[in-house]
């Protein structure tokens, strides 16, 4: 989509970088333009009228002026600030992690309405306090799908035979779950029958449906190991926000 000289867009602030003494460069995830960068002049000054509308996690309507190298933010109005998330360290860590993933999985200026809606819905559900751990798993699995990395969960990702109700293996390198026979030639971590069922259910249903799931700690742990391995394989690195999230989880034990 071609941007006019002056334009408005709804956006979620997914990243901010200091620039100079008082400026910032913001990464904005939008429904119609994809991921775009915006220069926010003097936004770090205490008297800036824009600062409160351009914080990380803010869902805002942003006005920009097109520039040669980077667009300049000329105005912003908050639509939703997710106060419940901001008032909880655990929810904040989860939300920052989701924003970091959205940033890394979104190519610049390539519209992906599904990605935008997924992140917005995830922030709304986290803010509502609806099963935060499951909410994050829903986000991660559907993030992979909306980015072209949808894991194969119904048939072996290597030999393409229907998966049997037995211990199978999750292999990011192969693109999903592989059968025991293919485990001899491919790298994979064991996943139980119930874990594969939960993965399928999350991948194929709405968040309102998965909220009703009752998942024990063992299955949740298997889910986390498999999905994290998949994300790490795609990004070729560990998301930074996971360090904070994991430290909070350990402190809560």
UniProtKB/Swiss-Prot annotation:
GO biological process annotation, one example: DNA recombination
Name the record gives this protein: DNA repair protein RecO
GO cellular component assignments: bacterial nucleoid
Keywords: DNA damage, DNA recombination, DNA repair
PANTHER family from the UniProt entry: DNA REPAIR PROTEIN RECO
One Pfam short name: RecO_N
Organism: Dehalococcoides mccartyi (strain CBDB1)
Gene: recO
Gene3D superfamilies: Nucleic acid-binding proteins, Recombination protein O, C-terminal domain
Tagged with keyword Nucleotide-binding: no
Known role: Involved in DNA repair and RecF pathway recombination.
């Amino acid at each position: 989509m071609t941007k006019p000289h002056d334009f408005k867009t709804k956006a979620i602030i997914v990243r901010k970088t200091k620039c100079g003494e008082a400026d910032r460069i913001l990464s904005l995830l939008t429904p119609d333009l994809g991921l775009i960068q915006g220069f926010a002049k003097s936004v770090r000054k205490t008297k800036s009228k824009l600062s409160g509308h351009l914080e990380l996690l803010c869902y805002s309507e942003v006005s920009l002026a097109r520039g040669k190298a980077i667009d300049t933010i000329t105005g912003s109005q908050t639509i939703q600030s997710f106060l419940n998330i901001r008032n909880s360290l655990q929810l904040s860590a989860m939300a920052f992690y989701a924003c970091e993933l959205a940033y890394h999985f979104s190519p610049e200026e390539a519209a992906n309405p599904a990605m935008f809606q997924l992140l917005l819905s995830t922030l709304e559900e986290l803010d509502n306090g609806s099963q935060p751990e499951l909410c994050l798993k829903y986000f991660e699995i559907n993030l992979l799908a909306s980015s072209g990395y949808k894991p194969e969960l119904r048939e072996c990702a290597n030999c393409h035979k229907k998966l049997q109700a037995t211990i199978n293996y999750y292999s990011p390198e192969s693109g999903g779950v592989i059968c025991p026979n293919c485990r001899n030639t491919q790298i994979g971590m064991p996943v139980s029958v119930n874990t594969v069922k939960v993965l399928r259910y999350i991948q194929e249903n709405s968040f309102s449906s998965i909220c009703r799931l009752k998942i024990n700690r063992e299955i949740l742990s298997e889910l986390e190991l498999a999905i994290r391995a998949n994300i790490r394989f795609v990004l070729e690195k560990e998301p930074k926000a996971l360090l904070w999230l994991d430290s909070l989880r350990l402190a809560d034990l």
